[in-house]
Amino acid sequence: MSRVTLASGQQLMFPHLVERAKPGVIAVLPNGKRFVNEADSYHDFIAALLAATPAGDTPQAWLLADRRALRRYGLGHARPFPFTPTAWLRTGYLQRGNTLAELAKQCAIDANALAETVERFNHFASAGEDVDFYRGASAYNRAQGDHQVTLGPLREGPFYAVRILPGSLGTFSGLQTDEHARVLDEQQQPIPGLYAIGNDMSSVMRGYYPSGGITLGPAMTFGYLVGKNLAKKNKYKQ
């Protein structure tokens, strides 16, 4: 996710769900190196970021795009043409450099490593194969691209970058419940009249995230069961 500051001063977080996979966009660490298949799911993206971050350092990455990619796809909260990046540059949300070296300086990225990374990625884009992270090799990757294409070079300046930080979409810890969504006490017995669903309930996925929106199905299912149970109890009371 990236942190957006609006003109009002309000801050919000923007999820980077799609544009990571578009041609002309890559993600790098402050050391200037790629660390992930950018077209993989956001869950895998952040898992790779956490794994690549040295102990004690802040997990962060930079999402980079050249002029063509920004104009066509946008970058995070910065929208594509016909919008211009002026407002996002003014707030500091976007960083810009006429060259990769200038952009690296703006973002405190290792300039030499970044130049090597972009050159290597551009070679992959021309060859049609990412031998480092296999971006575009899966149907999922290609579905996130532009008409099945996810590899594209970064060649046309100015170049742009936005800072990426880990965010959360759901939880894997919460109140223990039974199959009726009744909250359990320390003896694993239902607490009368107390239910929990959604992110308040201990996730049935137990820390895994097999698919986008995976928190929604269980919330709807157990919400239905709770409603059904309560309706039955009210019927008996009447």
Annotate the PLM regions.
Residues 1-238:
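Residues forming the flavin
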